[in-house]
């Protein structure tokens, strides 16, 4: 019984334990023995009834439990399915939310980083805008200064134009003066020529007079000699006459003792008388000749005195003319010196104004280039800022749309979860009502479940404390050269310059007040004799003069016909060595093949001096500045042309050869057609190295534009107005074999 009861008890307990239901309390046995049997019988009966009832109840309970377990299993399955679906949905939602959260977190982090970058950019933009404001203020100040400078330049240009007009007027006046001076000089030259002609005539007359004086002196000397001879002859005649008188006296004395000889002496006396008469005649002739000679001498002396007076007058006139011409020449030289000094001052002023204008144009070009660079940079920065702001706006709009979608999805998911939670609450309440009568035992812990998915990345932790200052690193490589900064403030006034050139001569002042009369000075030296007066009236005709002297010997007559050749004479002694003769005629011409001219020795690279070689070309880098057309003409005169750059190697070599901070013309222009750049030989560009934003044809109504190209710093190309002054580079082919000039 006990065993059966225990088995039943075990079965019931097993069945109850199976469903987690605890057993009920057992019946107490009667202690009385008499009642034991009854109780045992009743117990058997009750046990049988109980077994039957328990079996029936168990069956019913089992059926109900089966139904309940089936319903619970179905409900559990449904709930499991729902829970799995909910879990899958939650997982999906979790994955989606995780992905979306990750994406949103990444997007938010990117958005935050973008916002931080935008804030940083906005800060930089604000700083740049503040700097740009400062720079704009500086630019405005510089623009105002430029406007003031331009107004000053306009004023200076107007003053310079006025000065140039005045200079032109003065130059025209000086041209008039110069023409007048040229006319005066031509007149003076004519006068000088006439004076020279008259001077030559006077010199000829003087030479003739000198010749006549020499001839007269020779005649006078001859006359004096003849007079001396005549005087000697007269003395001789006188001596002879005295001797004759003495002889006559002796003859008278001796007449007594000569009477005897009278007859013999009569003939002698007749002869002597004839001789005496002849002597008397000769003496009378000599006296007449002497008187004629004295008259001629008087005439000659008067003529010589007149000639001397005329010579003195001519010398005085010549001296006066020379003094006048010297005074005029000194005045003209002084005037020319004044004109030269004025012209030098004018030329210096013009050169200074031209240099000042060139410096102004170069400064304006530099300011223009810097302004264009800054404006292009500002425009690029503004365009980039506008693009970034537009991108930020688009990103913010897309993020807002994504946030709205996420909010709507979250709202729908939360609503679904709230509905599912309400259903779960209802199911839990039903389960609670069903399992109120059962005591649920806590079972043993189940097996360990599979490893879950990796959780989401947590939010970043708080920023840590600032670390210690690290060691000083090594100095980095030097950075690239920064942009050119703004123009600094005006410096202090410089030192006083050197003394300028002498100014123009001032205008003549007003006439001063007359001074007090001074004391009477001493009498001066007598002046030079005045010029001779006019010729007087012709005097009365004088008596006929004496017979003139014998004239000079005439020129030799025409030689007669040549006679027959005589016999050859004996050879004479060798004569004295004569002086060296004149140089003989030039010899025969040297053949052209042997005649060479020295040429400038070229360098070993095949280029002339001051030319540089690269590959098969020669290049000339100018040291002076010139206009584009003048530079082109200069290169053409040197049998070359402005440089054509067709390769990068050539560009790099030219860049290395350039002098810093100097611009150079190249043979590139768009004068024929705008914005179609061609080399001077008409070919199109094969290689380009324009600066960023160039060519821009920067004119803006201020001129014809920029139609000529050149090299600036770092060898980049830029367009310039053709009227600018720049250095230039000439190019020509290298001469491999220099022919010898024959």
From Swiss-Prot:
Record-level GO cellular component terms: collagen trimer; collagen-containing extracellular matrix; extracellular space; membrane
Residues spanning the membrane: 38-58
InterPro entries: C-type_lectin-like, C-type_lectin-like/link_sf, C-type_lectin/snaclec_domain, C-type_lectin_CS, CD209-like_CTLD, Collagen, CTDL_fold
GO molecular function, one term: carbohydrate binding
A biological process from GO: phagocytosis, recognition
Extracellular compartment residues: 59-742
Keyword list, A-Z: Calcium, Coiled coil, Collagen, Disulfide bond, Glycoprotein, Lectin, Membrane, Metal-binding, Receptor, Repeat, Signal-anchor, Transmembrane, Transmembrane helix
Pfam families: Collagen, Lectin_C
Binding site for Ca(2+) 1: 644, 646, 650, 731
Protein name per its UniProtKB record: Collectin-12
Species this protein is from: Bos taurus
Phylogenetic classification of the source organism: Eukaryota, Metazoa, Chordata, Craniata, Vertebrata
């Amino acid at each position: 019984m006990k065993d059966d009861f225990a088995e039943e008890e075990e079965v019931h307990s097993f069945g109850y334990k199976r469903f987690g239901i605890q057993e009920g309390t057992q019946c107490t046995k009667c202690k009385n023995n008499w009642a034991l049997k009854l109780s045992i019988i009743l117990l058997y009966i009750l046990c049988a009834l109980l077994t039957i009832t328990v079996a029936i109840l168990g069956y019913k309970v089992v059926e109900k439990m089966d139904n309940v377990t089936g319903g619970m299993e179905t409900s559990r399955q449904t709930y499991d399915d729902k829970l799995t679906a909910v879990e899958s949905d939650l997982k999906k939602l979790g994955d989606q939310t995780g992905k979306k959260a990750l994406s949103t977190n990444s997007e938010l982090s990117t958005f935050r980083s973008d916002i931080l970058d935008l804030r940083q950019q906005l800060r930089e933009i604000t700083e740049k805008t503040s700097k740009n404001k400062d720079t704009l203020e500086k630019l405005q100040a510089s623009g105002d200064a430029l406007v003031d400078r331009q107004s000053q330049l306009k004023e200076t240009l107007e003053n310079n134009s006025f000065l140039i007009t005045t200079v032109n007027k003065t130059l025209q006046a000086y041209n008039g003066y110069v023409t007048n001076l040229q006319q005066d000089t031509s007149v003076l030259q004519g006068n000088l020529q006439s004076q020279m002609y008259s001077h030559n005539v006077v010199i000829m007359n003087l030479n003739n007079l000198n010749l006549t004086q020499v001839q007269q002196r020779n005649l006078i000397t001859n006359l004096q000699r003849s007079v001396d001879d005549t005087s000697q002859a007269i003395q001789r005649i006188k001596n002879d006459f005295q001797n004759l008188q003495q002889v006559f006296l002796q003859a008278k004395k001796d007449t007594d003792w000569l009477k005897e000889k009278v007859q013999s002496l009569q003939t002698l006396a007749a002869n002597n008388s004839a001789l005496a008469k002849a002597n008397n005649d000769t003496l009378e002739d000599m006296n007449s000749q002497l008187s004629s000679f004295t008259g001629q001498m008087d005439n000659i002396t008067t003529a010589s005195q007149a000639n001397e007076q005329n010579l003195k007058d001519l010398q005085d006139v010549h001296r006066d003319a020379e003094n006048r011409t010297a005074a005029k020449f000194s005045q003209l030289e002084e005037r020319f010196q004044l004109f030269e000094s004025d012209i030098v001052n004018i030329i210096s002023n013009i050169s200074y104004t031209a240099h000042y204008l060139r410096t102004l144009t170069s400064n304006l070009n530099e300011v223009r280039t810097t302004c264009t660079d800054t404006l292009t940079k500002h425009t690029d920065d503004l365009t980039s800022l506008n693009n970034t702001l537009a991108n930020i706006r688009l990103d913010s709009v897309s993020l807002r749309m994504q946030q709205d979608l996420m909010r709507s999805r979250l709202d729908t998911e939360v609503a679904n979860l709230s509905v599912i939670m309400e259903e779960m609450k209802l199911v839990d309440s039903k389960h609670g009502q069903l399992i109120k009568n059962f005591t649920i035992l806590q079972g043993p812990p189940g097996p360990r479940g599979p490893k879950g998915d990796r959780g989401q990345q947590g939010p970043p932790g708080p920023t840590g404390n600032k670390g210690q200052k690290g060691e000083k690193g090594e100095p980095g490589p030097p950075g690239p050269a920064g942009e050119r900064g703004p123009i600094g403030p005006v410096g202090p006034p410089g030192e006083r310059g050197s003394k300028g050139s002498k100014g123009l001569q001032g205008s003549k002042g007003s006439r001063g007040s007359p001074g007090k009369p001074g004391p009477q000075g001493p009498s001066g030296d007598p002046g030079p004799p005045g010029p001779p007066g006019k010729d007087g009236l012709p005097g009365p005709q004088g008596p006929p003069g004496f017979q003139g002297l014998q004239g000079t010997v005439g020129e030799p007559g025409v030689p007669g016909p040549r006679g027959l050749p005589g016999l050859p004479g004996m050879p004479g002694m060798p004569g004295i060595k004569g002086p060296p003769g004149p140089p003989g005629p030039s010899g025969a011409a040297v053949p052209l093949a042997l005649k060479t001219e020295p040429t400038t020795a070229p360098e070993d690279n095949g280029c002339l001096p001051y030319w540089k070689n690269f590959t098969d070309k020669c290049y000339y880098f100018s040291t002076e500045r010139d206009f584009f057309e003048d530079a082109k003409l200069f290169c053409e005169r040197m049998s070359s042309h402005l440089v054509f750059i067709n390769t990068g190697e050539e560009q790099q070599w030219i860049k290395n050869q350039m002098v810093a901070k100097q611009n150079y013309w190249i043979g590139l222009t768009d004068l024929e057609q705008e914005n179609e750049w061609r080399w001077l030989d008409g070919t199109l560009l094969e290689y380009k190295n324009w600066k960023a934003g160039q060519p821009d044809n920067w004119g803006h109504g201020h001129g014809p534009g920029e139609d000529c190209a050149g090299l600036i710093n770092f060898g980049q190309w830029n367009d310039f107005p053709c009227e600018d002054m720049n250095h230039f580079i000439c190019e020509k082919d290298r001469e491999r074999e220099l022919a010898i000039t024959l």
